[in-house]
Amino acid sequence: MNTFLMFGTYTAAAEKKVSSKRTKHANAIIKSLKGRVVAEYAMLGKPDLLLIVELPDVKDVIKASIELSELTGISFTTEPAVTVAEFDKLFKSIKK
C-alpha cells in the first residue's frame, strides 16, 4: 500500500453539506478502491481538511480524488508520502 496526503479545500456549497453521513460515504469510496482511511483532520486556514489514506497506487488515488470531489464539492490536492525509514533506505540506495 502507498500512503497519500489529501489536502481538501471547501467551497461555500461544500460547507453547507457537511455531515457524518457524507463522511461515511467518502470513507466507503476509499474502501471500494481497496484502500483505507488512516486519519481525517479538520484544519484551520488553508487547507480545510487533511485525509491520510493508503491506496494500492497513484491511479487509485486519482480515482478517489475525482469521486470525492464529485460527492463533496471539495477540491483536493494530493501528495504521496513515505515514512522517514523508507526515505532513509531510498536515499542510501542512491548514495554510494
Residue ranges: model-predicted function:
Residues M1-S32, R36, L44-P47, D88-K96:
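Short S/T/G/P-rich N-terminal loop/turn motif that feeds into the first structured element of a domain
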Residues Y41-K46, V82:
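A short beta-turn/loop motif at secondary-structure boundaries
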Residues I74-K96:
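C-terminal end-helix/capping segment
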